[in-house]
């Protein structure tokens, strides 16, 4: 994966850092081996005081291996413990074709992933607002005024007059074994996609290979896929059973529009809806949560949507009458029972007194 590894590094660290403005001090351990391995650096120096935000930006924009090492050392105390957390997240996401041995992406036979797995890691990371801020940043000035970074992969493209507006956020990487890699969030027709390019090469006049490949893929999606409205918010999709109600069914509706991106030549027969709907006991309130609707296209799950009830369902008259009778009878029964118990106690007391009198005679 090369330096797109740093997407995983950043999200693992972000989940352990509450305050991005908290200051940390760069140590010798943070910068050691960086130059020897030929890794990219944010050019931090031992003793330098920076914020966590600076360190995250240093990992993402100039692809600083020193920044990644600083994140690991400050959050876990060592590179090894941090890498364990990286692999723990990989397992949590159910990714079976990935394993990481360092925080930077320096080549190692046991450090590997796939485009699919990297897309899932990026998708997970983009659920974190702080990560989105870092991932989509184009330029950044460090808080101590000592560093200014730019996202080089996009900067060089803009310098050569390429239109890269489709790419809203990205992380690039390169090693001789992985070649050029890029994991991006792209915007195509106002829809966001994650695009991962690996083993891309600049050759025969084909420059900015990963960006060109990403734009090519984005343009393909834009010309071969379209947004389809399958259901509108409020559409009735099914009915559910109601016990003890004036009606034995309640209508169930979808809570939001279902807009799905599908191939231009999609077949409606390939779309499948799977409902998980609750049953109810009256009274039922309007807009009460009723379950979920999963949408599949060719057996691939595209989304899960909440369901709710269309209307109120009151209790049946017989249930109401039974409750009234129960509310009257139960206190009466309890009162009678208490009276019987009291009478039995009194009777027992009287009998005992009579026995004592007889004995005295």
Regions found by a protein language model. Give the residues of each.
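Active-site-adjacent loops and short helices of periplasmic peptidoglycan-processing enzymes
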Residues: 1-116, 120-129
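Domain-terminus/edge residues, biased toward the C-terminal soluble/receptor-binding domains
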Residues: 95-96, 107-355
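Short, charged juxtamembrane terminal tails flanking transmembrane helices
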Residues: 357-361
């Amino acid at each position: 994966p090369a330096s797109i590894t740093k997407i995983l590094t950043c999200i693992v660290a972000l989940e352990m850092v509450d305050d991005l403005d908290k200051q940390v001090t760069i140590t010798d351990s943070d910068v050691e081996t960086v130059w020897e391995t030929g890794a990219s650096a944010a050019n931090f120096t031992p003793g330098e005081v920076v914020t966590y935000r600076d360190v995250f930006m240093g990992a993402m924009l100039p692809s600083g291996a020193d920044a990644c090492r600083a994140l690991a050392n400050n959050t876990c105390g060592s590179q090894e413990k941090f890498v364990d957390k990286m692999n723990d997240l990989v397992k949590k996401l159910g990714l079976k074709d990935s394993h990481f041995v360092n925080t930077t992406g320096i080549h190692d036979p046991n450090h590997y992933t796939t485009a699919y797995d990297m897309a899932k890691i990026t998708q997970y990371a983009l659920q974190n607002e702080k990560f989105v801020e870092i991932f989509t940043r184009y330029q950044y000035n460090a808080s101590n005024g000592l560093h200014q970074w730019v996202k080089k992969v996009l900067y060089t493209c803009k310098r050569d007059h390429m239109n890269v507006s489709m790419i809203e956020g990205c992380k690039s990487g390169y090693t001789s074994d992985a070649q050029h890699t890029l994991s991006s969030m792209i915007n195509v027709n106002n829809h966001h996609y994650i695009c991962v390019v690996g083993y891309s090469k600049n050759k025969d006049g084909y420059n900015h290979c990963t960006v060109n490949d990403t734009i090519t893929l984005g343009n393909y999606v834009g010309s071969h896929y379209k947004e389809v409205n399958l259901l509108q918010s409020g559409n009735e999709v099914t009915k559910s059973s109601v016990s003890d109600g004036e009606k034995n069914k309640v209508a169930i509706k979808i809570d939001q529009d279902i807009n799905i991106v599908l191939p231009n030549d999609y077949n409606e027969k390939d779309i499948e809806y799977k409902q998980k709907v609750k049953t109810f006991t009256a009274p039922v309130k309007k807009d009460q949560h009723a379950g979920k609707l999963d949408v599949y296209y060719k057996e691939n799950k595209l989304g899960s949507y909440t369901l709710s009830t269309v209307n109120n369902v009151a209790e049946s008259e017989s249930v109401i009458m039974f409750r009234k009778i129960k509310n009257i009878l139960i206190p009466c029964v309890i009162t009678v029972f208490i009276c019987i118990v009291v009478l039995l106690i009194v009777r027992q007391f009287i009998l005992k007194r009579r026995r004592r009198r007889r004995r005295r005679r």
